A protein has these predicted regions:
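Short catalytic/metal-binding and nucleic-acid-binding patches
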Residues: 1-207
Length: 207
């Protein structure tokens, strides 16, 4: 389980019992690394995973929170460095750096995705009392080897909620990495990403 520490300068606040009871619990963590500007030597991958029959198994805020927290947890455990992510109602994308080269890097990727799918499906089927229900259809990955392709795919994933018409500004969608890159990347880096056109990118995204 990933824990997010408070700043040492944060002040502890006390809440009345009434306010504490009314507070809605949401996932508020974020990725613990800053954005990288270069391709990773071991391997850079873009991954897309889709729900079975494109059903909206992640439509609730809570399930998107759970899925994103699990992605962060697995990436940290397997030493992957996430560079972009977007979790939507029936699919997800992420771009990440593998810690391993060649076939070992691909195997590490398969481990992350299989655990994402296995653990989330088991939990949601238990919650819904639907043992054995198929949640995930498949996943698609691409090994990115060119810098321009890397930047274009980062832009695509950062802004994916806009592509699907969920928000006008992806920074307002908490289950994607747009606000993270704006807060942690340099203004020059963000400007460079925004200059890329993504309409010709070949990505499985018909969800």
């Amino acid at each position: 389980m990933i824990r997010f520490a408070l700043s040492p300068h944060s002040k502890k606040r006390t809440r009345s019992p009434k306010k504490e009871k009314m507070k809605k619990k949401t996932f508020s963590g974020t990725w613990h690394h800053a954005p990288e500007h270069r391709l990773y030597e071991s391997g850079t991958y873009m991954v897309t995973g889709g729900a079975y029959e494109k059903l909206s198994y992640l439509s609730s805020d809570n399930r998107k929170d759970e899925f994103l927290a699990l992605l962060f947890e697995l990436a940290k455990k397997l030493d992957w460095k996430l560079q972009a992510w977007a979790v939507l109602n029936n699919h997800y994308h992420f771009v990440g750096f593998s810690p391993l080269e060649g076939d070992l890097g691909a195997q590490s990727l398969r481990t992350i995705v299989s655990e994402l799918h296995r653990q989330s499906a088991r939990k949601w089927n238990r919650q819904d009392k639907t043992s054995g229900r198929k949640i995930w259809h498949n996943y698609w990955d691409s090994h990115i080897t060119f810098q321009r392709s890397f930047y274009a795919r980062l832009k695509y994933v950062h802004d994916n909620p806009v592509h699907h018409g969920l928000v006008d500004n992806a920074a307002n969608y908490r289950w994607c990495s747009r606000s993270w890159v704006e807060k942690n990347g340099t203004p020059a880096f963000v400007k460079t990403l925004d200059s890329f056109q993504v309409d010709r990118i070949n990505v499985r995204d018909d969800f």
